[in-house]
A protein has these predicted regions:
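Pan-zinc metallopeptidase signature
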Residues: 2-25, 29, 180-307
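N-terminal alpha-helical scaffold/docking segments in eukaryotic complex subunits
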Residues: 2-58, 142
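Low-complexity, Gly/Pro
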Residues: 3-12, 58, 82-97, 163, ...
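Auxiliary, metal-adjacent structural segments of Zn-dependent hydrolase domains
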Residues: 36-103, 114-118
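Short pre-active-site segment immediately N-terminal to the catalytic Zn-binding motif
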Residues: 106-125, 143-146
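A structural motif
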Residues: 121-128, 161-166
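Active-site recognition of the HExxH zinc-binding catalytic motif
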Residues: 123-139
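Post-HExxH zinc-binding segment in Zn-dependent metallohydrolases
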Residues: 144-179
Length: 307
């Protein structure tokens, strides 16, 4: 079920489009769950994102055949070889919906607006096919909101969610005799949170998808996400932490006091610090004995730390 933003700066459900990073804890939990479920090697199978040419949907292509073609692109990308998607269109609140049956045939419904505006068909289908992928994995979060955030996060981190961010745009529209700006958005993450997950993906795979964005607003949100993700790499006890963070960390270590993102424990083997891996957010525990290089047991990211 993909959220659909109505014209006029409205988000799914009729509220204003939310900005910033209000769901960051859930996004990080989703990344951890994804790595735990499919492993670091499984994530590496998605090193290449869905290319824009594969989901281009020209106006002269048959509506239903084109939708089936784009759905097959997503099925192939998410490695669901035996899944068959049947795509239809109707008026509804959300951008899309999928019936999560036993398979192998799945029925996807898309909002009727995609009949005439085909730019975001790939984005909506990416989200719905990811629902099928997660259903087959048996991976879900309790509650609709958190489960949709999991779906958006997985779609984005595994290479198709840049389409969801690119669906965020502001355009001039004529209403009656007035010219006004209308905003469109897909998904449950904020634009900046989509950018954050894309930044995490870029760091993991060395991929730069910014040239693929058609939307200037999506590009700005991606850059905001890059900046926020960069902060994760400058948190103590990581070696790249700034002077202020290092100074506070040293003070907290002496007092064995919890700090922003880290905590200490003292035992027979000495003091150890626990903090989140900036890639998968699995907790890492290291001895407090100066500069060292650590490897996350879950995602295999190597980190320089000064504990």
């Amino acid at each position: 079920m993909a959220g659909y933003a109505e014209p006029g700066a409205q988000a799914a459900g009729g509220g204003a489009i939310v900005h910033g990073f209000p769901h960051l804890d859930t996004v990080r939990a989703a990344l951890t769950a994804l790595y735990r479920r499919i492993s670091a090697d499984g994530v590496q199978r998605f090193a290449a994102s869905v290319h824009p040419e594969l989901v281009d949907f020209p106006a002269d292509e048959d509506l239903y055949l084109g939708a089936q073609r784009v759905a097959r692109v997503m099925v192939q990308h998410f490695r669901l070889p035996d899944a068959r998607m049947v795509v239809g269109f109707r008026d509804m609140v959300h951008a899309g919906n999928v019936e999560l049956a036993a398979g192998p045939e799945y029925f996807i419904e898309l909002h009727s607006r995609f009949r005439s505006d085909r730019r975001d068909v790939g984005a909506a289908l990416a989200h719905e096919v990811m629902h099928v992928y997660l259903h087959r994995l048996g991976l879900e979060f309790p509650g609709t909101r958190d489960n949709e955030i999991l779906t958006d996060t997985a779609t984005t981190y595994l290479g198709a969610g840049w389409l969801l961010l690119d669906a965020y745009r502001e355009e001039a529209a004529i209403r009656g005799e007035r010219l006004m700006m209308s905003a469109y958005k897909l998904g449950y993450l904020t634009p900046e949170e989509f950018g954050y997950v894309l930044a995490k993906r870029a760091a993991a795979f060395g991929e730069d998808i910014e040239p693929w964005f058609h939307s200037a607003q999506a590009r700005d949100a991606y850059r905001a996400g890059l900046a926020r993700a960069g902060q994760d790499l400058r948190q103590a006890p990581l070696a790249a932490a700034g002077w202020g963070a290092r100074r506070r960390y040293a003070k907290d270590r002496r007092a064995l006091a919890d700090g922003p993102g880290y905590s200490f424990e003292s035992g027979a083997s000495g003091v150890r610090v626990s903090f989140a891996c900036p890639t998968c957010f699995q907790r890492i525990r290291l001895p407090c004995r100066g500069r060292l290089r650590a490897r996350c047991a879950l995602c295999h990211t190597e980190l320089d730390a000064d504990t």
